[in-house]
Amino acid sequence: MSSKLLRGTFVLTLGTYISRILGMVYLIPFSIMVGATGGALFQYGYNQYTLFLNIATMGFPAAVSKFVSKYNSKGDYETSRKMLKAGMSVMLVTGMIAFFILYLSAPMFAEISLGGKDNNGLTIDHVVYVIRMVSLALLVVPIMSLVRGFFQGHQMMGPTAVSQVVEQIVRIIFLLSATFLILKVFNGGLVIAVGYATFAALIGAFGGLVVLYIYWNKRKGSLLAMMPNTGPTANLSYKKMFFELFSYAAPYVFVGLAIPLYNYIDTNTFNKAMIEAGHQAISQDMLAILTLYVQKLVMIPVSLATAFGLTLIPTITESFTSGNYKLLNQQINQTMQTILFLIIPAVVGISLLSGPTYTFFYGSESLHPELGANILLWYSPVAILFSLFTVNAAILQGINKQKFAVVSLVIGVVIKLVLNVPLIKLMQADGAILATALGYIASLLYGFIMIKRHAGYSYKILVKRTVLMLVLSAIMGIAVKIVQWVLGFFISYQDGQMQAAIVVVIAAAVGGAVYLYCGYRLGFLQKILGRRLPGFFRKGRHAG
């Protein structure tokens, strides 16, 4: 890849990661103010919105990026500009349709989410209010997403990265300010506070749009300067243009829906299953912990690992297109190994430190520290599946087998749908986690088979090195538990968030150092990270 594209990819990855970190950090003060009940109410609205947003955008932002990049490379800037205008019109229409459907269907979704009746102080009307407040964001976010895709198609990653961060900052400032003022100053009540917390999605979107508008004005000259240099135009009709665009968009739609769909299934089945099993008293709080508070923690290593590993995908596409299958196998190996090298120790660490970690972030008694720690313990290993599914789908797209990525998702979602309710009745939150894990495992097995079949990929080296990673992670785990045991003589993480933070930081630092040192001494670090590793560390023995 060119240095410009590499730099742009880094900027975009950094922006995305900063946004996700901010999206996790704000939950600390938010959870203190609204507790588990408020978290559940927030998720009832937000999970509906997330699914409708994915449907409304239809994968267009990523598809427009690919479309614009293709026609720009041919010098056909006129077709790129034509797509921007047409795409914005489509996003406006689909956003409005999604808004009206969600707004008008809110009573139905509210009843389903609550399990058919009022639940622990929350009524159907409360959930309807929150869903309708967040639905307003559907009028703006699709258009903003498409403009980001247009900039990315011109290899201008800065506008997307900066607008993502600003959108998140504006959203969080409004969310926390509104929640605090309504609860502490105006005594407006939990429902109104959470409603305005979800409404922050619209305010944040306006912030992101302002940034994009500033960038547009700043770069309008260079974009318009391309027009006189345009080559032969494709003269595509709108029908052909959108047909091509949909062919790009379809995989992004389905793959992007993976986590939202699994969350959506939990949101709409968990309470009903728990009530039928006789666990209504805890169902709502458990759902908030499962789908909001714990999941944010689980997604930290997922974000880092996938962002690091997916930078190799463009080179995979290039190798496949040129027919260089030997290089293709090496690149798939490096992508998979990079992700597993980062995600396995992170998951082991979070699992072993689930108690201190949950207490550090959500120390309030209203958020059930013991219950949260147990859910985090069992949920964190699923992060490995999340990461592998993302890269699995990306590789299938890279070798031009998008349809198999879609099929793998459908297989997993069907398994989740079938198993979720019976497993929740049997095992409560752990059952929902198990259903998610089984769904992702099925998707991954299918995806791995398709990659082997169509890319000629051998898993021999990957399996061998994964076993070594597990051994290194086990050694790291022993070090973490020893540190935690020693610290236990001086402080208890159960005494408060500060004590929990001390345990997490010291144990994680020691564990990480042990893992990296062992990997370095075995030459494992050098094998996997290669040139990404600073020169000082590129010595040592070589792992097999």
UniProtKB/Swiss-Prot annotation:
Residues that span the membrane, as ranges: 21-41, 49-69, 90-110, 127-147, 169-189, 191-211, 241-261, 297-317, 338-358, 375-395, 404-424, 431-451, 471-491, 500-520
Pathway as given in its UniProt record: Cell wall biogenesis; peptidoglycan biosynthesis
Disruption-associated phenotype: Cells lacking this gene are viable, have no defect in growth, but produce fewer spores, slightly longer cells and show an increase in cell chain formation. Also exhibits some resistance to moenomycin. Mutants lacking both murJ and amj have a lethal defect in cell wall synthesis.
Keyword Protein biosynthesis tagged: no
Subcellular location: Cell membrane
Conditions for induction: Expressed at low levels during vegetative growth. Expression decreases significantly during sporulation.
Main location: membrane
Keywords (A to Z) from UniProt: Cell cycle, Cell division, Cell membrane, Cell shape, Cell wall biogenesis/degradation, Membrane, Peptidoglycan synthesis, Transmembrane, Transmembrane helix, Transport
Disulphide-bonded residues: none
Membrane-topology descriptor: Multi-pass membrane protein
InterPro entries associated with the record: PG_synth_SpoVB (IPR024923), Poly_Biosynth_Transport (IPR050833), Polysacc_synth (IPR002797)
Pfam families attached to this UniProt entry: Polysacc_synt
One GO BP annotation of this record: regulation of cell shape
GO (cellular component) term, any one: plasma membrane
Function of the protein: Involved in peptidoglycan biosynthesis. Transports lipid-linked peptidoglycan precursors from the inner to the outer leaflet of the cytoplasmic membrane. Not essential for growth.
Family the entry assigns: Belongs to the polysaccharide synthase family.
PANTHER family documented for this protein: LIPID II FLIPPASE MURJ, PST FAMILY PREDICTED COLANIC ACID TRANSPORTER
Protein name from the UniProt record: Lipid II flippase MurJ
Gene: murJ
